[in-house]
Regions:
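Noncatalytic alpha-helical scaffold of FAD-dependent oxidoreductases
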Residues: 1-299
Length: 299
């Protein structure tokens, strides 16, 4: 079956962000955009707090196609939201080095760290080093796109830092314009509960997605890597409740802990998605562990 904006449009919209519940996608057609070179011009800027961070993020989004920020999620008080903002665009031919860029290998985490190694002290040390390194590198460089878009992959097997239990990622988007201070309140809640996250990534989120359960909407996206611990479920539930109050949404593709009642209160488009799903798959033959947890599908 083929679907698009013009053909079986309801199925098309349900499939975008539909978590695989509408069928197997065998072939996709999309339009690509030409780029001038395979290099990225990157600018970095150290920021002191969350207000300065959000202002710099909004200003960068007007002129730079790629913006992302790293935040020290353990900083509190006047330093809450301190971090590094990265701005990027494709380099023009005159700016780019002659050789085609190749990704460089980096150091490797050789083994899984013990659970006690990940604590507020070690995370604070990592954050201080990370902030210092980028502050010394200066404002503008030409870099490989892999280095810009996936900076953590410069350290191979970095997931071993979280030990055998691994980690989960909590990502949400908050309507900062309609709810000023929403990002500050989320970071305050995360820091106050000792999330001990090495990675807190903040992005400017663009237009509303077309899908019935698409994640994007105008606002600020916040992603936290959280070590899996006994208290992780409770921490995620607290953060999810805050997102609901602020009128935001959680990224379902990275969700492992959201409750069914939270999704129902968070997602006004859910009823339409369920209606379309019932039309095309009335027996709910396509289901997942997540749909069992969130949509009441049979296990």
């Amino acid at each position: 079956m083929r679907c698009s904006r013009d053909e079986h449009a309801d199925l098309f919209r349900a499939t975008l962000g539909g978590m695989g519940l509408t069928g197997h996608i065998l072939e996709v057609e999309f339009r690509v955009v030409p780029i001038p070179t395979p290099w990225i011009v990157q600018e970095t800027e150290s920021v002191r707090d969350i207000d300065e961070f959000l202002a710099a993020l909004a200003a960068a989004a007007r002129d730079w196609p790629f913006t992302v920020g790293w935040i020290d999620c353990l900083a509190r008080g006047a330093r809450l939201g301190r971090g590094v903002l990265f701005r990027g665009r494709w380099a023009e031919p005159a700016e780019a080095p002659a050789p085609v860029p190749r990704p460089r290998g980096g150091p490797t985490v050789p083994f899984e760290l013990p659970s006690w190694a990940l604590n507020d002290l070690s995370v604070r040390l990592f954050n201080a080093v990370y902030a210092g390194v980028h502050a010394r590198r200066g404002r503008r460089r030409v870099v490989h796109p892999q280095r810009f878009f996936w900076p953590l992959d410069g350290v191979r097997s970095w997931n071993r830092i979280y030990g055998r239990r691994g980690f989960t990622q909590f990502q949400c988007v908050l309507p900062e314009r309609e709810r000023p201070g929403a990002t500050r309140r989320l970071l305050t809640a995360a820091a106050g509960r000792g999330g001990a996250s090495f990675l807190c990534v903040v992005k400017d989120c663009g237009a509303e997605g077309e899908g019935l359960l698409s994640f994007p909407r105008p606002g600020v996206s916040v992603a936290l890597d959280l070590p899996r611990r006994a208290e992780t479920q409770q921490l995620v539930e607290v953060l999810a409740e805050l997102v609901i109050v602020e009128g935001g949404r959680v990224y379902l593709a990275k969700d492992s802990f959201l409750r069914a009642d939270q999704l129902a209160r968070m997602e006004p488009r859910l009823a339409e998605f369920l209606r379309v799903r019932a039309r095309w798959d009335p027996g709910r033959r396509l289901r997942s562990a997540q749909s069992v947890r969130l949509l009441g599908d049979p296990a």
